[in-house]
Amino acid sequence: MKALLDLFKQVQQEEVFDAIKIGLASPDKIRSWSFGEVKKPETINYRTFKPERDGLFCAKIFGPIKDYECLCGKYKRLKHRGVICEKCGVEVTLAKVRRERMGHIELASPVAHIWFLKSLPSRLGMVLDMTLRDIERVLYFEAYVVIEPGMTPLKARQIMTEEDYYNKVEEYGDEFRAEMGAEGVRELLRAINIDEQVETLRTELKNTGSEAKIKKYAKRLKVLEAFQRSGIKPEWMILEVLPVLPPELRPLVPLDGGRFATSDLNDLYRRVINRNNRLKRLLELKAPEIIVRNEKRMLQEAVDSLLDNGRRGKAMTGANKRPLKSLADMIKGKGGRFRQNLLGKRVDYSGRSVIVVGPTLKLHQCGLPKLMALELFKPFIFNKLEVMGVATTIKAAKKEVENQTAVVWDILEEVIREHPVMLNRAPTLHRLGIQAFEPVLIEGKAIQLHPLVCAAFNADFDGDQMAVHVPLSLEAQMEARTLMLASNNVLFPANGDPSIVPSQDIVLGLYYATREAVNGKGEGLSFTGVSEVIRAYENKEVELASRVNVRITEMVHNEDTSEGAPPFVPKISLYATTVGRAILSEILPHGLPFSVLNKPLKKKEISRLINTAFRKCGLRATVVFADQLMQSGFRLATRAGISICVDDMLVPPQKETIVGDAAKKVKEYDRQYMSGLVTAQERYNNVVDIWSATSEAVGKAMMEQLSTEPVTDRDGKETRQESFNSIYMMADSGARGSAVQIRQLAGMRGLMAKPDGSIIETPITANFREGLNVLQYFISTHGARKGLADTALKTANSGYLTRRLVDVTQDLVVVEDDCGTSNGVAMKALVEGGEVVEALRDRILGRVAVADVVNPETQETVYESGTLLDETAVEEIERLGIDEVRVRTPLTCETRYGLCAACYGRDLGRGSLVNVGEAVGVIAAQSIGEPGTQLTMRTFHIGGAASRAAVASSVEAKSNGIVRFTATMRYVTNAKGEQIVISRSGEAMITDDFGRERERHKVPYGATLLQLDGVTIKAGTQLATWDPLTRPIITEYGGTVKFENVEEGVTVAKQIDDVTGLSTLVVIDVKRRGSQASKSVRPQVKLLDANGDEVKIPGTEHAVQIGFQVGALITVKDGQQVQVGEVLARIPTEAQKTRDITGGLPRVAELFEARSPKDAGILAEVTGTTSFGKDTKGKQRLVITDLEGNQHEFLIAKEKQVLVHDAQVVNKGEMIVDGPADPHDILRLQGIEALSRYIVDEVQDVYRLQGVKINDKHIEVIVRQMLRRVQITDNGDTRFIPGEQVERSDMLDENDRMIAEDKRPASYDNVLLGITKASLSTDSFISAASFQETTRVLTEAAIMGKRDDLRGLKENVIVGRLIPAGTGLAFHKARKAKESSDRERFDQIAAEEAFDFGTPSAPAEEPQQHPAAE
């Protein structure tokens, strides 16, 4: 019977396609889609519920309501398939054709498509070269447009009001034609000759010089060329026929109580049909023009609402006063077609439940409740029951399963064996959020999860839920097992660290077991082996922490690598260790020495241990080891019985004295402030500093007391050992809590921040053990509340950032092994403030060297170019003291659509070179986005305690060596003989004997140098000191002070401190100055020599002038004698706000969005010499004269700080005016490498502040995508337009073609796009439309007649194909190869056949002409 039924099934052919094209539909095309015209607004008959004929649900047009049954019931059953009933006109076929058959409405008057009218920039306006307002006035019948001026002086496309029109008609009669409404616009569009227009525009573009015109012409040219290329006629933007959506896609559902629920589209269509029919009738009746015109306008508005309600005028509303949901609303936004249905589908064979911990599971297992498994694996069970003959039909099998008979449970066990399931925890922030496990059947209703995978899922057991998905096909099961099994994903793709690191109780247990105690029971005993130790421990002869000597057998790598030799050989050594460590040595994998365990295991150590195991012993051994570590950790933690009590929080006895001293200091500052020696701001800064330091000191005293305890050793001597205090052990091991939190429990809570980030100067001197008083508690609530509010707000921001990142990188896949480029970037250790923030080894690990790595001492090549630098290589490089290595980077990869494996380097989640097909773009986006949400959630952990680093006020050397100053360092010697720095960008370096840089420190303007160039110093020597709370203005010349424009009440204000009564002069902000004249002047100082002449800058005719910035406190008086290096004014630095990640997320977003910062610093456009020109009103003029003698001027606001002085040589791209850097300038002036370094370092700074590790290459991948487009500067012979932005790969392809044809290629500039803009300007319109601004993207694509080659992942998910990554990439490659080989074979056969029949091989279309026939 089944075979019989299959006979009648319609053959459904799966379409294989490689691209999707979008365009405008011509009226004929729309009619060809349609199955009939919808003439009536009726939907269904309210009594019979049958659709009305010719109405919106008409069965004749759209197909039958029931399968194989016509409406009147004359033809039923399959045998009449394809018959059209003569009575009701319905074709007998499947009812589901009502989902695909369209209808149409013939409009009585043409109507403009609102997308092409109102979606900015207006496409109609561009094609017609008219303004949007004018076109709108014509379309909505408020004005006439001239179509054919004839012999009159009128111009085509001229707009006239009705009055004008009647006057002109009286004047010229019917010599000209003007129209209103869409008919007029359609006529104009028809009249356009595109080819002619394109030619004229191209010539105009070449001849015009005005920027505005070039821009305008280029835009119009682009649109017209698009029409020309795609073969779309402009008049199709005006609709004559309106397609009607199939009825099943806009259903009408009867509710109980005789009411109906309907899709808004039906309402919108009804309005269109009603107005259209009324208009038809009015036209037949030859109604007065004004009535017809009104009806046409109403029709236009009805169609507008149907296509995009609310885009123009007020949105049409339904009965409930809500705007109706139009066709455009159906596809855009989070709930639209793209994001709701195409990118996010719900799937079958899935379930969800609460998770509980499963400590007995192996890493690759999960506990699945029996009832869930029964439901999830139903089809498999049915199949087995039939095969085994327990049930004969599916129905019988169903009954068996429902009754849950014994045989069903046996079958379930069998079905589940070796059939992995996938577990997912929302939010899935990176690829480890979904992993595959082998299910183990358990009782109860909760899923059991292995404790070690919790870190990857970010799961805890406080009520989290997880979803289970069953991979059905064999391929899916295979992929789940090989690629997604939890035991195959032990490294984080973000940084290559192990993800299966124990936490909390496991760490505590291992730490407790590996600690050592002085004079423990059985100390000093010797044992012949581990089994003896265990026996002694079980008989309570020794304690876990006792120091003992044990003979331990290690399995080490065999030196003998000949065939048949075992990989590991035993090695026996005697170790001084502790009982706990000896017991743990049992689980050590082969190939690891005991020394890795012979120390207290803290969380970091355990992570390092697992990492070492992975690198040395491979994946399998590591997974087994991690599992055993976990088992031991839990067991030992239970044995340890660590708990907390109030007495564990030891408050240091010195606390009172420390706090008392601080209070005295604060009082002293108050006194100084009262007597006017310091400003309010300085006092505040100092008070905050004192309390910060006090908080630190109390914390330190507390930690000292907590971390050690007095003991008596074996010889009866008093000594101190590391404490066994429970709280200390928890924090020290990294199990829970931190020093900061303990400080709040037992030290002092310290300073708190207000919600705006400023610090409250009264600290909380109490701690939680002593308890807070009401005021202290109240101050604390600020931080806690802010934390919660931040969390709520920022989770959304972080998710949005991830979404943008994924969107910009989703089409970046590794597609080949090596692109063969010789470009790369130079990597150095990252040094900040003299500290190595990131060592060179960490930056180059897993990269491919692009140049030979050479030993600096012997000049021999250590690693050839093209080597993948692994752990051994980077250790060797570090040992040799090489401080710079050039490596490949995704930025310079020359693969056209994607990346090559060599430029990407190691796949961090697998630990080997990346495979072809890896979706590295998405991995990069996830790696950057995932911690984003953690950053957001990490604000309130410290409970808002203001952790403010006391500001740096000096630099000291970290290593021995020789002091070297950079070329930019300049200093003068003052009257006291001190060296005062007067350069803005000077740096001091410490070099070793080989001249290799060991550290580098920025020395700020105004610092006092304590060591000079070339001095040999020891580590710890101070190099320079400065006042951290003010920025000085220093004179480089001596003389008598002469003020200019320093007028009280005009440019400066006398600030009399209301407390102290002392006065200082402060430069007033420009915005607050009264008169216009005073806004343009700048208070400054000139110096006079002994004769009263102005002091000149040596070698020039310019007088020395030193300007005061806004906010400067002037410390000298007019007529005062000053010496070289003396301070003229001080600028107080702002009170620092606490650094919270609040700055973090937005900072990352603004870097990736490539926003220009406000008040950006100015970079030198050229290399040359600086000089100052004549100042204008509010600006100073800086001139750079380049090497050819050309002058480049910069106008700089007076309050800005210029970093260069007269006659200084600057290099192109050097910062000349202080301020945050603009990434666009960096790209333009310093190039791609500098830009990438800037973005990578800035993003890393934010994450490093939070202690988050992300590999640089992820950020580089994103920067590559931001540089995806180029701007054409000279189009050569290509099809591009100058100034146009095009995809880099398109441009390279086009240039290759030009070179092949011996034509001129185009030249271009790099352009940096923000991630949102880059996503929207991608080649794939499907991907862009599903991201943001759907309407705009689709409008543009339709006009261009764009073709989407389905290169990215997103497009393929949307059209439902396998994604071109991983196994999907291989599938598509194989498919394409087969297609091309089939084509070749086909051509070959065709050629052979033609040859066999003896037909002439000439093409048949053109008959061969004999010369004689002419």
Curated annotation (Swiss-Prot):
It catalyses: RNA(n) + a ribonucleoside 5'-triphosphate = RNA(n+1) + diphosphate. Mg(2+) binds at D460, D462, D464. It is an enzyme of class 2 (transferase). Its EC number is 2.7.7.6. GO terms for molecular function: DNA binding; DNA-directed RNA polymerase activity; magnesium ion binding; zinc ion binding. InterPro entries: DNA-dir_RpoC_beta_prime (IPR045867), DNA-dir_RpoC_beta_prime_bact (IPR012754), RNA_pol_asu (IPR000722), RNA_pol_N (IPR006592), RNA_pol_Rpb1_1 (IPR007080), RNA_pol_Rpb1_3 (IPR007066), RNA_pol_Rpb1_3_sf (IPR042102), RNA_pol_Rpb1_4 (IPR007083). Its cofactor is Mg(2+); Zn(2+). Zn(2+) 1 binds at C70, C72, C85, C88. Binds 1 Mg(2+) ion per subunit. Binds 2 Zn(2+) ions per subunit. GO terms for biological process: DNA-templated transcription. Zn(2+) 2 binds at C819, C893, C900, C903. Residues 1400-1414 have a biased composition (Low complexity). Keywords: DNA-directed RNA polymerase, Magnesium, Metal-binding, Nucleotidyltransferase, Transcription, Transferase, Zinc. GO terms for cellular component: DNA-directed RNA polymerase complex. The keyword Magnesium applies. Belongs to the RNA polymerase beta' chain family. DNA-dependent RNA polymerase catalyzes the transcription of DNA into RNA using the four ribonucleoside triphosphates as substrates. The RNAP catalytic core consists of 2 alpha, 1 beta, 1 beta' and 1 omega subunit. When a sigma factor is associated with the core the holoenzyme is formed, which can initiate transcription. This is DNA-directed RNA polymerase subunit beta'. It comes from Burkholderia lata (strain ATCC 17760 / DSM 23089 / LMG 22485 / NCIMB 9086 / R18194 / 383).
